[in-house]
């Protein structure tokens, strides 16, 4: 699933980017416009080390690091592991796999965002796949959307299934990156004033939907009877 998603997005012009799994609060939260009182920053939700470092809760951290290293335009995807203090059950793991993407340039629009993700999801699930965008909230994007696709699940009639989150990058994110680079937004800015979109997809959830896997724990239990189906 991971390789197929990467192949499609690379064909669309996205470059692979990577970053550390042990992160700091700036790259995981502050730069992503996440306020100090946000529940995601609580020790009940995030794995913190005594040093103050943490296990990244999403691969959006790589988007910030990519902007720090590159000059616009930026078009990257960052597949990798993320970690949260979730109670492990049929749909949740404390360590899971994500794929996130970022595109930043001049005059990037919501239409670009929707067109990109519709193309990607139809390449993944079939050209006739129905896709819809629902308004949502994320701290680091505005406007924000959740994406549903209409699929047959467990042999039942087609129904809407939540598949990803996305949105237009909040201007506060660009300003945070510029300040970290020592650039004054609006004066020497590298990113302030540009536009862009970001998206995030759970690869484990994609695999569960694609192959009708009912329990996410099957992906990590190394049961050969299960794994043999995918050779």
Language model: regions and residue ranges:
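TRNA-recognition modules of translation machinery and tRNA-sensing kinases, especially anticodon-binding
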Residues: 1-231
């Amino acid at each position: 699933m991971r390789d197929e998603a990467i192949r499609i997005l690379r064909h669309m012009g996205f470059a692979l980017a990577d970053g550390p799994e042990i992160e700091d609060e700036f790259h995981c939260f502050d730069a992503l416009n996440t306020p100090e009182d946000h529940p995601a920053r609580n020790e009940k939700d995030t794995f913190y080390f005594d040093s103050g470092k943490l296990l990244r809760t999403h691969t959006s951290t790589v988007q910030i690091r990519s902007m720090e290293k590159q000059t616009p335009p930026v078009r990257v995807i960052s597949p990798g592991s993320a970690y949260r203090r979730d109670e492990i059950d049929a749909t949740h793991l404390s360590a899971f796999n994500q794929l996130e993407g970022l595109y930043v340039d001049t005059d990037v629009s919501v239409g670009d965002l929707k067109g990109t993700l519709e193309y990607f999801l139809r390449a993944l699930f079939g050209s006739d796949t129905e896709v819809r965008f629902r308004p949502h909230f994320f701290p680091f994007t505005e406007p924000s959307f959740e994406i549903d696709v209409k699929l047959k699940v467990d042999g039942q009639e087609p129904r809407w299934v939540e598949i990803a989150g996305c949105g237009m990058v909040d201007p506060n994110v660009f300003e945070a990156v510029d300040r970290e680079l020592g650039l004054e937004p609006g004066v020497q800015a590298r990113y302030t004033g540009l536009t862009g979109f970001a998206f995030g997809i759970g690869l484990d959830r994609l695999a569960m939907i694609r192959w009708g896997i009912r329990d996410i724990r099957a992906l990590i239990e190394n049961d050969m009877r299960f794994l043999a189906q995918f050779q």
